[in-house]
């Protein structure tokens, strides 16, 4: 756990204790000062949570627990104001937690790795029950796991963003690689993990190209799935690269290629419990070609709809890109 976050949480707890004391003794001036300080500390805690990329579902769950505790304290100590306010916040937080954890969660696209379909500033809705429901803030499944399908645009935690993950978990088939390939992967993975890993991981959104048992090859912008070339047609070319329409599992989507990828030719045979995820912007995507497979253990959900486009704060939000994700 982050030391700064622990100190902030402990400070908030001390402030909360003082607030209860000043409320009981009817010392309004000190109570109001304590309330203001607690509010400012809470804002700093939220900033730290976002900096650490912690699961916001876990934050909501903790806030719900604190509201429930305050409700009980208010009732036991006879602090009517605390009891009423805590009761209201508790039910509001529980509803928000349930909606976000068990139905749909908003997610903002942070990079160009899924262009042209998903652009920086797109806000998408992630279906949290598409692959089975999990207890908020954890990887514990509450319902049976539903496996991702080829062509799904999935949100997940890639292995290199989790400090606890061993490189062999990212490539369980590493023993089947030759010495140069395995060493190259280990060096690349360890470097990425050292620079990007957190305790809670970082959410990525990519397209699932391979499921367990599949043999996948990428040759330039061509994808071969179990020995069959995935149909594609070149739509045109501009300063950003070649625009290609690809048809996978009977559904069409657009990809972009510049022909510059360092992993232009590679092949995988996907092991059990693992999935191959590639960005639609083929030469500008940090994906399975660099860090291996993602595990079904770290699935978050399926990105289904674009509901808002807001690339920068200097521009007004737009609904022009709203629609189902291809």
Predicted regions and their residues:
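Soluble "head" domains of membrane/secretory-pathway proteins
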Residues: 1-33, 37-45, 63-67, 77, ...
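Aromatic-anchored segments of alpha-helical transmembrane domains
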Residues: 39-49, 96-102
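Alpha-helical transmembrane-segment detector that highlights a single hydrophobic TM helix
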Residues: 49-86
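Residue-level signal for well-ordered alpha-helical scaffold segments within enzymatic catalytic domains
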Residues: 71, 88, 97, 101, ...
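Internal/C-terminal transmembrane anchor helices
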Residues: 77-105
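Generic hydrophobic alpha-helical membrane-segment signal
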Residues: 88-89, 93-94, 98, 110, ...
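Short charge-dense sequence patches
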Residues: 98-106, 250-257
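Membrane-bilayer interface helices and TM-boundary transition segments
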Residues: 104-114, 129
């Amino acid at each position: 756990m982050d030391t700064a976050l622990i100190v902030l949480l402990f400070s908030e707890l001390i402030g909360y204790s003082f607030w209860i004391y000043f409320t009981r003794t009817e010392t309004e001036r000190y109570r109001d000062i304590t309330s203001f300080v607690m509010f400012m500390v809470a804002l700093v805690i939220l900033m730290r949570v976002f900096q650490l990329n912690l699961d916001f579902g876990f934050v909501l769950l903790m806030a719900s627990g604190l509201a429930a505790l305050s409700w009980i304290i208010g009732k036991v100590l006879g602090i009517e104001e605390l009891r009423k306010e805590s009761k209201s916040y508790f039910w509001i937080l529980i509803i928000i937690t349930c909606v976000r954890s068990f139905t749909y969660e908003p997610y903002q696209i942070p990079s160009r790795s899924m262009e042209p379909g998903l652009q920086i500033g797109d806000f998408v809705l992630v279906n949290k029950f598409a692959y089975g429901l999990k207890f908020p803030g954890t990887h514990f499944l509450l319902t049976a796991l539903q496996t991702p399908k080829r062509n799904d645009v999935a949100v997940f935690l890639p292995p290199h963003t989790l400090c606890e993950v061993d490189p062999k978990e990212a490539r369980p088939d590493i023993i089947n690689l030759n010495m140069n390939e395995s060493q190259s992967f280990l060096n690349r993975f360890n470097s990425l993990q050292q620079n990007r890993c957190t305790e809670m991981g970082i959410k990525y959104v990519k397209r699932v190209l391979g499921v367990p048992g599949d043999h996948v090859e990428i040759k330039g912008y061509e994808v071969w799935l179990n020995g069959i070339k995935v149909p594609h047609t070149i739509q045109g070319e501009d300063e950003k690269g070649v625009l290609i329409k690809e048809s996978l599992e009977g559904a069409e989507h657009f990809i972009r290629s510049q022909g510059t990828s360092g992993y232009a030719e590679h092949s995988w045979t996907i092991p059990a419990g693992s999935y191959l995820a590639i960005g639609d912007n083929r030469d500008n995507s940090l994906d399975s070609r660099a860090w291996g497979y993602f595990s079904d253990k770290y699935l978050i959900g399926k990105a289904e709809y674009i509901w808002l486009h807001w690339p920068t704060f200097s521009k007004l939000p737009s609904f022009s890109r709203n629609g189902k994700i291809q």
